[in-house]
Regions:
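Append "and occasionally in soluble cytosolic enzymes with long acidic Gly/Pro-rich linkers
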Residues: 242-244, 440, 450-452, 539-685
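Detector for C-terminal structural segments
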Residues: 53, 58-207, 550-585, 597, ...
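Gly/Pro-rich hinge or "lid" segments in bacterial periplasmic/extracellular proteins
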Residues: 213-231, 237-242, 340, 361, ...
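Extracellular/periplasmic solute-recognition and catalytic clefts
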Residues: 300-312, 440-456, 472-535, 546, ...
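Aromatic- and charge-enriched surface segment that lines or borders ligand/interaction sites
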Residues: 128-135, 252-318, 341, 348, ...
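Short, well-ordered beta-strand elements
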Residues: 193-203, 265-269, 287, 353, ...
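N-terminal lobe/hinge region of extracytoplasmic solute-binding protein
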Residues: 155-157, 163-164, 176-182, 199-259, ...
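C-terminal motif of bacterial Sec signal peptides marking the signal peptidase cleavage site
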Residues: 23-27
Length: 769
């Protein structure tokens, strides 16, 4: 599957939504100190060292003292194929274990997320598990319980979403899975102007052709524009989030076949009358160009992941090919024979292609999404001279020599096509679009995009045929968006949340029912405090749990939503089938506000020292410290310091101590940020537990993409700083799949591991030493 489709159909989730939390049964209790060995914490009791300050000598930080992981082999890679759900046991804390070949393994986030969608085979003669759904639901429960234990982010509120719109728009309906970009295509305007202005508080960045390119997650506004300008996907979602074949695109139902070697082949034939916005014809090559390109070093050099086809047969061999080494053995640790042709990607004729998935992924629970492909203009991913070539004997596809051609730029050799891909990704490149609309203009200063109706696009089975002539997409600010709406400067404000904003929106509708309308739904997701879980204090689960315990989340949610929301305790939507199936047995820590419980977590995690390496004394010491050991001594951790320069990792008598500092970036303007300043950063509870929190105001793109995801093009300067940032996450699809989102694989880590959490339980070396 191409990267944009994979992100859309699998990762999809950085803007999650609300659910009204039903009361939990007795299993939803506050957990006491956790004694598992999973978290990256060195356990301790609050005794500290009794030596005087004069006995400890302060030294310089030595990068040579860093201890970084070298072996990223995962438990799932080694034993995943041997494990069935009936082999798994659950301890009283809700953590999962399995014994294989005499070795007992704790199942980490990577294992559980992969097993949840790839190990749903029903055990033979099982009384408990009768269907793949039963197996999936159990894996899902164990995954949620571990997430709840490790706390990679803190759900702050789960609310109702209100979408406010001008009454001139008819048929505008939204759901947790059917956002404004889909709803506006299906809607009509009843006035002569036939135009609509959409608004969003999330900045546009201009990444409209593939909003996921080079990112772990797409910006929600960029994704809206991509959805409005993209069409002819082989599968689509409907209003309830479920997937179906796009009958206007596929010529007959695509065939799926499990082969003798356990691999799975999808064969897809598309119709012959599909056209881009410039009237150029679409054929099968347009559907596989991105998959091929972004499985090569050229795609990676252009900012892609280079791993789009990682689950397809022959990926390792094809991705190793660089245009010069066909048939040669390459690689140091894992040697493969490079090949020009991608064995698992076949072009059968001009309108038919086939993709074969490896046996490891053939049993995918949501198998239909593996057949999800969208067409792209060939130059977008192949450049002006690149082309798809076919092995006549096998029908396997590859890319021509021109695609791999190199040039010298600034004294360095690089792929020529990589630069073309970067240029072609821009909204105003000469390439056509495939969907209901085309981008006619984008103003980077005001973050405003103008879209015009694509008369060539015939519509689809789900959204129908678009009829609104012009859509303008503008930047909104909370403080002024209601005034803009009443003045006609915006026609749709989507995702209104928060008590004051919701009440203001409803008042506008109630005062002018003939002029304004609203639609609302329970949000499938939540606003959150997200963490960078591989750097500084927030790389420790004990710290993340302590933060969870010192934010009164129930009070926060009620204050922010004005009673139009509540709190959830993990990444789930109470309206989902999986949650409903396990809600009576799931074990969740609700993290009731408690300073003492937070202190207990920190003490248990080894945060028991002061800046002198002595026992922390709350009566006279301000900030706790932790003595680092093992992989806690990572290269980045040795550089950790507060953004204001007051605190940093110190070296005393050859031992390293980390301060309990959290560098928080708050997006502005944002009511959640303002509330967090009061409820968390400057609250007495933070001081009481010995935590120091810095606050840096940021805009969305430099905060999320620059500091959290460390993308230089968004302002990252090469020095890690951020520990926490508030934004939102959402389940915008009925497909709940977080496979690869917790990967240890360093080739995938930056593109897929959105929380940057490497669960120590997932490292295979942990069980072999």
């Amino acid at each position: 599957m191409e990267e944009s489709a994979m992100k859309k159909f699998r990762l999809l989730a950085l803007v999650l939504a609300l659910l009204m939390v039903v009361p939990f049964v007795a299993s939803c209790t506050d957990k006491k100190d956790d004694n598992t060995t999973t978290a990256a914490d060195s356990k301790g009791t609050e005794t500290g060292d009794t030596t005087s300050a004069g006995d400890k000598v302060k030294g310089d930080i030595d990068p040579a003292d860093a201890v970084d992981h070298k072996d990223f082999t995962s438990v799932y890679d080694m034993i995943g194929s041997k494990v069935t759900i009936d082999m798994v046991t659950e301890d009283e804390e809700g953590l999962a274990w399995v014994t294989v070949d005499g070795v007992k393994y704790e199942l980490g986030m990577d294992f559980l997320s992969m097993a949840m969608v790839y190990r749903t085979d029903v055990p033979a003669n099982s009384e408990k598990y009768k269907t793949a759904d039963d197996v999936y639901n159990e894996w899902w429960k164990l995954y949620i319980q571990r997430w709840n234990y490790l706390v990679p982010e803190i759900p702050l509120y789960s609310n109702q979403y209100f979408d406010l719109y001008n009454a001139k728009i008819d048929g505008f309906v939204t759901t947790p899975y059917w956002g404004p970009a889909d709803a506006i295509v299906a809607a009509k305007v009843t006035t002569a102007d036939n135009s609509v202005i959409l608004g969003s508080a999330t900045d546009l960045s201009g990444s409209f052709r593939n909003s996921s390119w080079g990112k772990s997650n797409p910006g929600s506004s960029d994704l809206d524009i991509q959805n409005l300008t993209s069409g002819y996907a082989t599968i689509m979602t409907n209003k309830d989030g479920s997937y179906s074949w796009n009958e206007g695109v596929v010529d007959g139902t695509p065939a799926s076949k499990v082969n003798e070697d356990g691999t799975l082949t999808f064969t897809i034939k598309i119709k012959k009358d599909l056209k881009f916005s410039d009237n150029s014809a679409i054929n099968a090559k347009n559907y596989i160009a991105a998959l091929l390109s972004n499985s090569t070093p050229v795609g990676a050099a252009a900012g892609g992941s280079g791993t789009a086809g990682q689950t397809v047969v022959g990926f390792a061999e094809f991705s190793a090919y660089d245009g010069t080494n066909d048939g040669k053995e390459v690689g140091d640790k894992n040697k493969v024979t490079a090949t020009k042709f991608f064995k698992g990607v076949q072009l059968l004729d001009d309108y038919t292609f086939a993709v074969t998935y490896t046996s490891d992924y053939a049993g995918y629970y949501y198998s239909i999404v593996n057949a999800g492909f969208s067409p792209d203009p060939l130059p977008l991913y192949l450049g002006s001279e690149g082309a798809i070539v076919v092995d006549e004997a096998t029908k396997a596809c590859g890319l021509n020599d021109a695609f791999y051609a190199k040039v010298t730029e600034n004294g360095a050799e690089t792929y020529k096509v990589a630069g073309e891909i970067v240029a072609n990704m821009k909204w105003n490149s000469a390439l056509p679009y495939s969907g209901p609309y085309v981008v006619s203009n984008y103003d980077d200063n005001t973050h405003t995009a103008t879209l015009k109706l694509n008369p060539v696009y015939p519509g689809d089975s789900f959204r129908g045929k678009a009829s609104i002539a012009t859509i303008t997409y503008v930047k909104l600010v909370d403080e002024t968006q209601m005034d803009m709406f009443k003045q006609g400067q915006v026609d749709v404000i989507a995702g209104i949340t928060g008590g004051d904003a919701t009440k203001a929106a409803l008042k506008i509708v109630n005062d002018n029912p003939d002029k304004y309308k609203e639609t609302h739904y329970d949000r499938a997701g939540y606003g959150k405090l997200g963490f960078r879980c591989d750097f500084g204090s927030t790389s420790f689960a004990s710290v993340r749990r302590a933060i969870m315990l010192t934010i009164n989340r129930n009070e926060f949610a009620q204050t922010f939503t004005g009673g139009y929301g509540s709190v959830v305790h993990g990444p789930y939507y109470e309206g989902s089938a999986a949650y409903k199936a396990v809600k009576d047995t799931i074990k969740l820590n609700v993290y009731t506000y408690s300073v003492q419980s937070a202190i207990d977590e920190l003490v248990d995690g080894g945060w028991i020292y002061n800046e002198k390496g002595e026992k922390f004394d709350a009566a006279k010491d301000t900030v706790r410290y932790k003595k680092l050991s093992g992989y806690e001594l990572s290269s980045d951790n040795l550089k950790f310091k507060s953004t204001d320069g007051k605190y940093s990792v110190i070296k005393l008598d050859g031992e390293y101590y980390m301060p309990l500092v959290v560098n928080w970036y708050g997006t502005q303007p944002n009511d959640v940020t303002n509330q967090l300043v009061t409820a968390w950063q400057t609250a007495k509870a933070a001081k009481d537990i010995g935590m120091y929190i810095t606050y840096t105001s940021t805009e969305f793109n430099p905060g999320i993409y620059g500091e959290l995801y460390r993308m230089e093009e968004n302002g990252y300067d090469g020095t890690p700083k951020l520990n926490a940032i508030n934004f939102a996450t959402g389940f915008t699809s009925a497909v709940y799949d977080y496979a690869f989102n917790w990967t240890l694989n360093q080739n995938l880590y930056n593109d897929y591991n959105t929380a940057h959490l490497m669960d120590e339980a997932d490292f295979y070396e942990k069980y072999t030493k």
